[in-house]
């Protein structure tokens, strides 16, 4: 893709899912990112954890933890974006969502611009089979949901107590939907970010490159992939959990650090997710995704999801 700002020939950024994040396990990672000139996006939970639902990734620090809040505020002051990953680690009715968003605003001085749904929260917007538009995709999604026994997702269902779609549309500019096994997301989703008229409560969607933990992240941005991203003039929005193996005992994973250092020496645009998506919108006049592109994107995601169920 041509037309990046300044001398940049490609773009790279990261959306960090807050699951499991603490000051101790992600702090060193952000120091590394900052020192190398990357400005990325970190998500947070504004409300305290629901203790009965802290299994798996549904744990970590929140904006109610004083030292963690100071850390998050410092990151924002340094140019990182702070985004939303739902208002907490469990289901939230409309009033809880409103309270969480207000706390986010009170602590950081503004509402979040970027959001991703959290795992199986019932307040997720267009999640589960709601992510899919094609009939074949929805059928496959329903089969998957049956076998996984997932709960309904109702953040976009106006009759539900979990509805907050109108609030999402009012405050949130960008929501992540699919993750793909590709470093250059514009190869599979050239209309980035995109609006889907079938999902009116989301202003714009974006697609990410899968790299959930340090191993898959490093494999996704290996040397050959970096060079291809640069050669193609592509865009990479990594989706990851910096809490999952990126630092141990205060020391950043050496392979991760080496790959980032190499990438930082290239002529890339290294800005947060919302800033990158804002820029991309200035380069085109049409933001509505066409059926063929969306159907192809869905098929690719479904195939990847079947092979790697943990993918988001």
Report residues per predicted region:
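Aromatic- and acid-rich polysaccharide-binding/catalytic face
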Residues: 198-210
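Catalytic alpha-helical scaffold of carbohydrate-active enzymes acting on polysaccharides/glycoconjugates
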Residues: 1-201, 215-238, 246-312
């Amino acid at each position: 893709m041509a037309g990046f700002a300044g001398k940049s020939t490609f773009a790279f950024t990261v959306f960090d899912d807050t699951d499991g994040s603490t000051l101790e396990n992600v702090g060193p990672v952000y120091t590394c990112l900052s020192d190398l000139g990357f400005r990325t996006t970190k998500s947070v939970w504004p409300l305290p954890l629901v203790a009965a639902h802290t299994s798996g990734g549904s744990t970590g620090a929140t904006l109610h933890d004083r030292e963690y809040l100071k850390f998050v505020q410092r990151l924002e002051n340094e140019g990182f974006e702070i985004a939303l990953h739902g208002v907490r680690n469990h289901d939230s009715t409309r009033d809880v969502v409103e309270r969480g968003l207000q706390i986010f605003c009170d602590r950081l001085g503004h509402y979040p611009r970027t959001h991703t749904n959290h795992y199986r929260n019932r307040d997720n917007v267009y999640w589960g089979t709601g992510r899919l538009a094609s009939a074949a995709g929805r059928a496959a999604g329903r089969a998957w949901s049956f076998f996984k026994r997932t709960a309904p997702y109702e953040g976009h269902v106006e009759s539900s107590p979990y509805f907050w779609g109108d609030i999402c549309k009012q405050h949130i500019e960008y929501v992540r939907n699919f993750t793909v096994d590709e470093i250059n997301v514009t190869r599979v989703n050239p209309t980035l970010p995109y609006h889907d008229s079938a999902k009116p409560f989301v202003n714009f969607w974006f697609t990410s490159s899968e790299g959930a933990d340090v191993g898959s992240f490093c494999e996704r941005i290996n040397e050959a992939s970096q060079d291809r991203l640069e050669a193609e003039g592509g865009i990479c929005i990594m989706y990851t959990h910096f809490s999952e193996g990126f630092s141990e005992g205060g020391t950043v994973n050496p392979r991760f650090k080496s790959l980032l250092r190499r990438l930082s020496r290239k002529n890339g645009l290294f800005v947060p997710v919302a800033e990158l998506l804002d820029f991309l919108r200035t380069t085109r006049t049409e933001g509505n995704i066409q059926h063929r592109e969306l159907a192809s994107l869905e098929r690719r995601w479904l195939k990847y999801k079947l092979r790697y169920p943990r993918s988001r």
